Amino acid sequence: MSLAELRLEDLRCLERAQLALDPRLNLISGDNGSGKTSLLEAIYLLGRGRSFRTRHTEQLIRHSAPRLWVHGRTLPEPGHTVGIKCDRDHGMQIRIDRAPVSSRAELSEVFPVQIIDPGIHRLVENGPSQRRRWLDWAVFHVEPGFVRHWQSYTQALKQRNAALQSGADPTLWEPELIRCGEALTLARSRLMSELQPHWAGARDSLGAVGASMSFFQGWSRDFTLAQSLERHRLHDQERGLTSMGPHRFEVLLRLDGRAVREILSRGQQKLLGVAMAVAMTRYIAQAARRTPTLLLDDPAAELDIARTEALLGVVRGLGAQLVVTALRPEQTPLGMPNAVFHVEQGKVKRL
């Protein structure tokens, strides 16, 4: 899948832009601060319903504008149209094929997109929440019913926590919590197992350290989820929240028995983060028969020449639509771009 057309208004420093993208390699050049990364944000917004730079979408609105608007059209034909409007006062509105949708998950179904940017080390360095989103995004693409189970589990978890805090009976919500929680855990565990060869291949081809990747389900494997909820019920009542369950799952990255974020440099963490993105792109392409569009924001940042060339070599072999930023076109040795755009002072033109 790929993005054929991007149109936007009032996103960060970009007042208005329209790009006809190629399904292969697209290069966006321009000085720092010109708006290159903002174009990637617009594309990412179409596939994820959020920015990769901030949790607050309203921060993307150009300072003098009341709202932003982004529109995209996907391939292959007949494709889909995606429209997103974000208003300072009324939040975000999403439309797919002109019909309003309430869930951002529906965006990923029509336009899957991944980002490799200078901050990708945070996928390794930060706490578990980013790795949870990374894994669940992929599970959504390959497991029918995952979103439905996730929504039901989240609702049951809220109700159980409310009961724990109010002194009501928390067991009323446990059957639904267990039913949906076990389905979530099975789907996540299965994907993690199937992902392993893609992870090892991406990690090794990039020359990253040989870190292992494993899955912690959110409670001890010595007990069922029902047993774990029962064992921790008194503790949960004292704390007013559910301490064990699929909402506490983690993707663990370890080297010699230690968490890699404790022992690796920023550059090494970045390589592992890139390997995670590449591995997931390969997996989705194989398992879901759809190849995500891959965004690369300044791929040479913080990597030496050898590692940059290794990254670009791996990326070239994915068969994905690529949208890459660089200060100058010659700084991205990916071969001849199929489309080149230049951004200057918030204005975009095709070269």
Predicted regions and their residues:
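Structural recognition of the conserved hydrophobic beta-strand(s) that form the central parallel beta-sheet
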Residues: 72, 320-327
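Walker B catalytic acidic pair
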Residues: 297-299
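Conserved lysine of the Walker
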Residues: 36
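Conserved NTPase motor "head" modules and their coupling/switch loops across ABC/AAA+ ATPases, GTPases
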Residues: 1-31, 45, 57, 168-179, ...
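Long, charged N-terminal accessory/stalk domains
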Residues: 122-123, 129-171, 175
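Hydrophobic/aromatic beta-strand patches that form the interior of the parallel beta-sheet core
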Residues: 114, 323, 339-341
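Nucleotide-state sensing region of NTPase/ATPase domains
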Residues: 44-130, 136-146, 193-201, 230-234
